[in-house]
Amino acid sequence: MKKKLTRKEKREAEKQINFFEEFLKIRKHFFCNFNQKLKSVNEVRHSSYITYEPDILLFTIIMKNVSGIHSMNKMTKDFNNDTVINNFSKVLGYNDLEEIPHYDTINNFLKKLPISELEKIRIYMIKALMRKRCLEKYRLLDKYWCIDIDGTQIELTSENLLV
């Protein structure tokens, strides 16, 4: 029987994990077209206001969540160093990335971005996992897909939750 980790031991173990490296392994194995999907987001911003492409903005917020950073302000502070900027540049294929976007820039972008654009990325990811049969062990009686329904919402956010 495995020894249950204490909360302190769990925190210490998490310090040893390189979340960025782990994310890159997962992305490479399961989502080989992930960067292209981020680049293909149709945005509504006026071209004269664009400093950062959609893939940079979306990748930054994804890495915030992957890294376990809970606030946008902390993300801006933690990511504002040359190592992070160089890593983002390499992963996204940019040679001229000098700064990571400020959290206000990301928030403004996300406010204007149609939800359907994010749904396209989510659908791509779910389909990729299903194609690789990663979700097979979660079938009911090895035959049926289970669907979780959360009935706590007050409003419907989308007509097409998953196509």
Could you say what each language-model-derived stretch is?
Residues M1-K8, V44-E53, G93:
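Short N-terminal helix-initiation segments at or just after the protein's N-terminus
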Residues M1-N35:
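Charged, often Cys/His-bearing segments associated with DNA-binding zinc-finger transcription factors
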Residues A13-E14, P101-H102, K132-E136:
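Alpha-helix boundary/capping detector
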Residues L24-F59, M63, N107:
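Basic, short loop/linker segments at the boundary and entry of helix-turn-helix/winged-helix-like folds
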Residues N33-E43, G68, S89-D96, R133:
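Glycine-centered secondary-structure boundary/capping sites
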Residues Q36, E98, T152-I154:
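Flexible, active-site-adjacent loop/turn segments at secondary-structure boundaries
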Residues I50-Y124, A128:
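Short, positively charged, Gly/Tyr-enriched micro-motifs
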Residues N107-V163:
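Active-site-proximal, Lys/Arg-enriched surface segment
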